[in-house]
Amino acid sequence: VVEVTGAPGGVKAKGAVLVDAATGQVLWARDAGTERPMASVTKVMTALLVLQAGDLGRQIRVPEAAFSYAWEHGGESAALRPGDVLTAQQLLAALLVPSGADAAYTLANAYGPGLDAFLARMNATAARMGMRHTHFTSPDGLPYPTETSTYSTPSDLVTLGLAAMRYPAFRALVDLRFYDLPKGPGHHQYWWDNTDELIGSYPGAVGIKTGYTDDAGHCLLFEATRNGQTLIGVVLGSPATGPAAGVQDAEKMLNWGFRLPRAG
C-alpha cells in the first residue's frame, strides 16, 4: 500500500487518475468519473477485441474505404495502401503506433464484420468490463457523429488499459518508438513512428496510447514501471499548450506517484 500525501502539482488536465497497477489503489484523481471524449485512446478497445479474437496471423486485405474513411474524418493515418494484405498483428501495429484511423477501419470491418457490428461488440465489451460511463460510436475516437458521442472516464480507461496490457502482443507494440515493416508478399514497406512521446523519453514508460481532437484536448493513457512498482494513469482534456501537453501532465503525475512512500 502506498502512503498518499498531497497531490501532483501543475497538472492541467480536466480529468485524470493515477493508480497502482498491482493493487488497484487510487493514488490521485481529478473528476475521474466524469464522462469526456477521449479521442484515439478509443483504439485500445479496438485492439482488445482483436486480441480477444486470438488469431493474430489472420490475413486481412486493406479495403478501398479505409483510405477515404481516414481522409474524410481527418484522422491520423498509417498510410495503408488499399489492396495490401497484412496480418492482424501488423494492423495492430498500424493502429497503436502511428494511431492509424485507416487501420482502425480495416480491423473493425474485418472483425465485426462491418463497422456497425464491431461498434456493438465494443459497447457490449465495455459493459461486460464494468465500464458503465463509456460509449463508442467509432473504432478510433474521431469526432463523429458528434464531438462527444464517443466518451469515457479516466477510471473506465484505467480498467481498459489494465485489460489490454495483460496481452504480451499489446504490451510489445505500445512500448515501441517505431515499427518497421519491410516490403513483403502482398504488401508495401511501412515505417510507423509512435505518437506517444512518453516512450523513449520517460524512464520506465511502457505505453500506452495518445489521443487528440479539438474537443477532447490532449489525452493519454499511460503506464510506467520503476523499482518494481507499476503505475497506470489517464489524462483527458489536457489543454493545447503544445503537442506533448498530455505527456507533460503524465510526467508530473508519475514523478509524484513514484516518490510516495510504500508502507511496510
Model regions and ranges:
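Active-site-adjacent loops and short helices of periplasmic peptidoglycan-processing enzymes
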Residues: 1-155, 165-168
